[in-house]
Amino acid sequence: GRFSDLLTELNIPFPKFGIAESAEEATLLADSLDFPLLVRPSYVLGGQGMKIVINKQELEEHVINLLKSIPGNKLLIDHYLDGAIEAEADAICDADGNVYIIGIMEHIEPCGVHSGDSNATLPPFNLGEFVMQQIKDHTEKIARALQTVGLINIQFAVKNDIVYIIEANPRASRTVPFIAKAYGEPYVNYATKVMLGHNKVTDFTFNPQLKGYAIKQPVVSIS
């Protein structure tokens, strides 16, 4: 895809992946991607239909079920980085290429649990400086390459001190209001002014305040 081409051009690592539209295509892909695999439908929200499979039988069953429930959908199949730590970064960017990272969060659950369902800490509690620098560098490179104006959220998988890109969303993420509240900074206000062209990122004086850690927890409505 175009995004993987961009990551290759930027020399940023990402898990091996492929796209399938049938169980037959999925099993053929599995030979080159290697198990375990993360299977998910495209163009859905909230991790709907996402599952980790460990063999061809599980893969075929899940693909058949997905295509029954969401007919005509293309399935994204990634090599699952077993044992990886998931992290994410949010940033504000302007048309001049200025990028300010408002927060980096580390997920407590293993990589593969959807970000909306996971607990996370701000700032990260278990990522070394080498990993943190990779996250910052990748975030700035991707934000500029996508010519982002406003907010961007990028999700990462960290394994053996290598930071892989899971996905990038050039939009406001669910984590932005959490980070803004934790740091006591009006990030949404800043980003809106940047998007409208009223200000550049460099016009603002950022002064985040946080003692200790802030913990993001999912809230589930049960009726």
Where do the PLM segments sit?
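ATP-dependent carboxylate activation and anion-phosphoryl transfer catalytic cores
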Residues: 1, 10, 33-36, 46, ...
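A conserved helix-loop-beta module that forms one wall/lid of the active-site cleft
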Residues: 1-50
